[in-house]
A protein has these predicted regions:
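Short, compact, well-ordered microdomains
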Residues: 77-125
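N-terminal domain-onset segments
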Residues: 1-74, 110-131
Length: 131
């Protein structure tokens, strides 16, 4: 599945709707207000994000001055025990900095159609996420 702004939006909206992610509304607000700085072209569906400086936009995480992953979720996908991993990154101010979307640990390109097996097999939410 080729990476595009439309695909980035679909993955972002998918995560925002997940019950496991407590900051879904903030994720959508951040995505709508900022802009994608770079789409990865390696075969994954990741992007680097440039957030809005508008202080009215809700943050994903409490500002701690550090860039890092604030949410991770891993799904089995399809019958071949493949996995799809999502990692949400925040900058030191707590704003969206990017989203990594990998298939099989980024060993293979993202296929055109992915069927997720529920429930996710791994979920990690940073204590810094604003719920």
């Amino acid at each position: 599945m080729s990476n595009s702004v439309a695909q980035a939006r679909r993955w972002t909206e998918f995560l925002a709707r997940r019950l496991e992610f407590p900051a879904g509304e903030a994720l959508i607000a951040q995505f709508e207000a900022g802009q994608i700085e770079r789409l990865c072209d390696c075969g994954c569906n990741s992007y680097i994000f440039s957030p809005s400086a508008d202080p009215a936009i809700p943050l994903l995480a409490h500002a701690d001055g550090k860039y890092g992953s604030v949410f991770e979720v891993l799904f089995r996908a399809g019958a071949d025990n493949a996995t799809v991993e999502f990692l949400v990154f925040a900058n030191g101010n707590g704003a969206l900095a990017g989203l990594d979307v990998h298939y099989c640990g980024n060993a293979y390109p993202m296929p055109e159609a992915v069927v997720f097996l529920e429930p996710p097999i791994h979920v990690r939410t940073s204590p810094s996420v604003v719920a």
